[in-house]
Amino acid sequence: MVSADVIEKLTKVLKPISDEQGANAAVALLLKSKRSDFDVLFVKRVKNPSDPWSGQMALPGGKRESKDASLKDTVLRETLEETGIKLDRYRFLGVLTAVKSEPKPEINILPFVVLLEDEPKLKLNKAELETFIWVPYEEIVQSQGMVEFSFGKVPAFILADAVVWGVTYKILSKIVKAVEEASRK
């Protein structure tokens, strides 16, 4: 269980929103508050041969555009475009350490951690996203394992309704560590 106290302590563990760390893309790690825990939003990307993350579970977000004054602008714009959620009405807790995608294309992604106090109404951009799921944080923590692909075994979160691996796995691993650190404070 993750208490409201831990959420407050999490703000001290995370980096400030202004710390962009040389990133060129941003994602929203959306934590929907519940009484004694939170759920995390995952989206499933549509299958698209030109998308290196085609069909994978992901977090809303994307690349910075020239019109974005900051990566916060990027995550606000991309989350609205993909999910219909207006993040500017929610509380930004901070950012995690940026994560590099691999192998290609190499993108440096800044994960913004955002607390949602209510259930947002989602309107998916069907050109980019197939579906979405909310997953209880405790299920994520308890679901770490390995998954086999044609190219070998990789670490993953094996959830009831999805497998999360790759760059999204790296980001989730960082929030799990941050919550653990906040719990010890």
Give each language-model segment a name.
Residues 1-19:
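Entry/capping segment at the start of metal-dependent catalytic domains
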Residues 3, 165-168:
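Generic structural signal for well-ordered, non-membrane alpha-helical segments
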